[in-house]
Amino acid sequence: MEAAQQKNESVMDYAPDWTQISVLFFVVMGGGVLASLSALALAGTVVLMLILTPVFLLLSPVILPVGAVIALAAAAFMAAVTIGIAGAAALIWVYRYARGQPTVGSEKIDRARVRLFEAAEKLKAQLQYKLFNENSKANFD
């Protein structure tokens, strides 16, 4: 008797409890519902393709040019909006830079301006030196 009771207890240790059974039930039911919905979507797609394919073939000489015009108009509109946004961002950057507010890249602009000014000063000095030397040679000749 004790061996049967011990065997029964060991089987009960591996038996699923109520929460595991309920989770399994809801997972199977949810999977079934989702599989049914996907089957309905597939059936609807097939039916619509069967109905609309002849209509599309009959109207394609009209639909394709209209679609191309709409696509080009949408692309042009998106390009115009993008260019407008870029222009507005550039104007905001210039406004902030002119007012002395911190802007992205202003350090590079300032360094380039200083380097350009230094190069201009150096070129000015070189030209003055050359002109002075040419004038002094002309005076001695």
UniProtKB/Swiss-Prot annotation:
Q: How does it sit in the membrane?
A: Multi-pass membrane protein
Span of the annotated motif Proline-knot: 54-65
**Main location class:** other
Q: Which residues cross the membrane?
A: 23-43, 46-66, 74-94
Q: Where does the source fall among the domains of life?
A: Eukaryota
Please tell me whether the keyword Electron transport is annotated for this protein: no
Entry comment describing in which tissues the protein is expressed: Expressed in megagametophytes (at protein level).
Q: Which InterPro entries does the record match to this protein?
A: Oleosin
Listed under GO biological process in this entry are: lipid storage
- Annotated Gene Ontology cellular component terms: membrane; monolayer-surrounded lipid storage body
Keyword line:
Lipid droplet, Membrane, Transmembrane, Transmembrane helix
Pfam families, sorted: Oleosin
Q: Where in the cell is it found?
A: Lipid droplet; Membrane
What does the record's free text say on domains?
A: The proline-knot motif may be involved in targeting to lipid bodies.
Of which family is this protein a member? Belongs to the oleosin family.
The protein's name is Oleosin L
| Natural source organism | Pinus massoniana (Chinese red pine)
